[in-house]
Amino acid sequence: MPKIKTLQAASKRFKITALGKYKYKHANMRHILTKKSTKHKRHLRQKSILPKIYLTTIMKYLPYI
């Protein structure tokens, strides 16, 4: 049986933690930042844990990670 290829776009966007959870960076921090509040931008800077509903999809994309 052939090996399953890893989706490279997903491997660049998601990292696995020591407990086996997936963390990712928030969107909306590239441009048009003047209209966003400081509090909103501060919360977007932090990494977040992937919700369980997306876990099976991401695990298909990253079979060996």
From Swiss-Prot:
Keywords (A to Z) from UniProt: Ribonucleoprotein, Ribosomal protein
Pfam family membership, one: Ribosomal_L35p
Keyword field contains Ribosomal protein: yes
Gene Ontology biological-process entries: translation
A GO cellular component annotation in the UniProt record: cytosolic large ribosomal subunit
InterPro entries: Ribosomal_bL35, Ribosomal_bL35-like, Ribosomal_bL35_CS, Ribosomal_bL35_sf
Organism superkingdom: Bacteria
Family of the protein in this entry: Belongs to the bacterial ribosomal protein bL35 family.
Protein's UniProt name: Large ribosomal subunit protein bL35
Source organism per UniProt: Blochmanniella pennsylvanica (strain BPEN)
